[in-house]
Regions:
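N-terminal Sec-pathway targeting helices
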Residues: 1-14
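Hydrophobic alpha-helical membrane-insertion segments, chiefly the h-region
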Residues: 16-26
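Bacterial extracytoplasmic/cell-wall-associated proteins, especially those involved in peptidoglycan
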Residues: 19, 64, 80-300
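Ser/Thr/Pro/Gly-rich low-complexity linker/stalk segments immediately outside membranes or between
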Residues: 27-40
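Extracellular LysM carbohydrate-binding repeats and other cell-envelope/extracellular binding modules
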Residues: 38, 74-76, 85-87
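Glycine-rich loop/hinge motif
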Residues: 38-65, 152-158
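Short, glycine/charge-rich beta-strand/loop segments that flank catalytic centers
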Residues: 49-51, 73-80
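Extended intrinsically disordered, low-complexity coil regions enriched in Ser, Thr, Gly, Ala
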Residues: 66-76, 135
């Protein structure tokens, strides 16, 4: 079978530009043999897990040269009404949480809008993967196994926006680099995230504040392991020490692992957790007294 080839020629000064069969050729008029033009390859761009939009913009600037402010403005102005998975997102909220972290190939001429489209497409595919057999009800709400009676803002179940918000908190609470570790270490991190998701669901179920240091860091713009007492008093709806329930929106762009965690949590009787230093491994507690003992044991 012969492939059909399309040929387009453009003559500029002493050179004819020919497009044929998906390749570009420059033919000088005095030469018969075409000379292929050097094709600029796509650029591999890696957006790591758990970055906020401002950090994604910084990464895009470093890897593709698009100014940070330009990308941030494009995100702010992006028309996203056609995406079904964004229907539960408040109209005035940003796309925080939905720019899926992954490794992409972008043409050097890619615009901010094209990059955003690819990342939103990545989220759509990965969220569907995380769902597995779990489907939303007729109202677009997910009823989470083990937490069927959970109500958020007087409504039973979790919307996609609420799930992504919780996943973004879990991402920042449990994220650590296991890229060079074993499959066992990655599996352990996945299990930790599902267990932490269960802890947060336990707290949400009784109206107990999440008390997430990651949300404090988002409110203050810092990246510290232990926020100061002054940080904990920050006036912000993202301060989950002062405000019970979920934050107003996501605090990062979570990984597939964290999306799976909120959709398929591990139900336990734990209500507290902390991170061993320096490994970052999570230690769980059933009550505050156990939590204090673990702090004295692992955080000295």
């Amino acid at each position: 079978m012969h492939k059909r080839l399309f040929l387009v020629t453009i003559t500029l000064f002493f050179v004819t530009i020919v497009f044929v069969g998906g390749a570009l050729y420059a033919i000088q008029r005095r030469h018969r043999a075409p000379e292929p033009i050097a094709v600029v390859p796509d650029t591999k761009v890696t957006i790591i897990e758990g970055l906020a939009i401002s950090e994604v913009a910084t990464s895009i600037e470093k890897q593709l040269g698009i100014p940070k402010a330009t990308f941030e403005q494009a995100v702010k102005n992006f028309e996203a009404s056609e995406y079904d998975f964004l229907k539960s997102k408040p109209a005035k909220s940003s796309l925080e949480g939905f720019l899926f972290p992954d490794t992409y190939l972008f043409a050097p001429t890619s615009t901010s809008e094209e990059i955003i489209e690819r990342m939103l497409g990545g989220f759509e595919v990965r969220f569907a993967q995380a769902q597995g057999s779990l489907k939303p009800n007729a109202n677009g709400v997910f009823i989470i196994s083990g937490y069927e009676n959970l109500s958020i803002n007087g409504k039973r179940g979790m919307t996609i926006y609420e799930l992504v918000t919780l996943a973004s908190i879990i991402e920042r609470e449990t994220g650590r680099d296991v890229s060079k570790g074993t499959a066992d270490s990655r599996e352990r991190l996945d299990t930790e995230r599902r267990t932490v998701a269960g802890i947060f669901y336990n707290r949400l179920g009784i109206g107990q504040a999440l008390q997430s240091d990651a949300t404090i860091n988002y409110a203050t713009g810092k990246r510290v392991a232990s926020p100061s007492l002054e940080d904990l008093d920050v006036e912000s709806l993202y301060n989950t020490y002062e405000h019970a329930g979920l934050t107003p929106g996501p605090i990062s762009n979570p990984s597939l692992s964290s999306l799976e965690a909120v959709l398929h949590p591990i139900k336990t009787n734990y209500f507290y957790f902390l991170h061993k230093q320096p490994s970052g491994e999570v230690v769980y507690s059933r009550n505050f007294d156990e939590h204090v003992r673990n702090k004295n044991l692992y955080l000295k």
